[in-house]
Regions:
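N-terminal membrane-targeting hydrophobic helices
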Residues: 1-145
Length: 145
């Protein structure tokens, strides 16, 4: 999934868990688990495209803008911010798209070659992510954030 998809789903998880009074350590653990689970859903990743540098800069930039907005103007709780950041953090390895050459370093276990990472063609894979964005926003709205 894209970095922003992980951030949005993490934020929605943080909104729900924060509303229920979950401790921050549990929010962090749940956000990491959510990242792994979402990576198994069939989706399209831009990391193997010709324009991966543009995609990764846009994705990471949009995610940073979202989290900064949530922290400053959005009045987000610590649970929302932490879950959003932690869920997105493993995908920062997309920034190695900026490096020359084809070798890609993957640090997070769900990014390793043996992990059952979901894959889909660009259009349906992007539609899946857009549906996840909408669901995440609805969950946050329903949780009062």
């Amino acid at each position: 999934m894209w970095v922003i998809t992980h951030a949005l789903t993490g934020m929605s998880l943080g909104a729900v868990l924060g509303q229920r009074g979950a401790p921050l350590w549990a929010v962090v653990a749940a956000a990491l688990l959510l990242h792994v689970l979402l990576d198994m859903v069939p989706h399209w990743d831009y990391v193997r495209t010709r324009h991966r540098v543009i995609w990764s800069l846009g994705d990471v930039g949009a995610t940073a803008a979202l989290l900064i907005w949530a922290a400053t103007l959005g009045d987000a709780s610590w649970a929302v911010l932490l879950a959003g950041a932690v869920s997105a953090l493993p995908d920062l390895d997309v920034l190695n798209a900026l490096w020359p050459g084809e070798r890609r370093i993957r640090i997070f276990p769900s990014h390793w070659s043996g992990f059952p990472h979901g894959s889909a063609p660009p259009v349906p894979g992007t539609v899946v992510q857009a549906a996840v964005w909408v669901a995440s926003v609805l969950v946050m709205w329903n949780a009062g954030w």
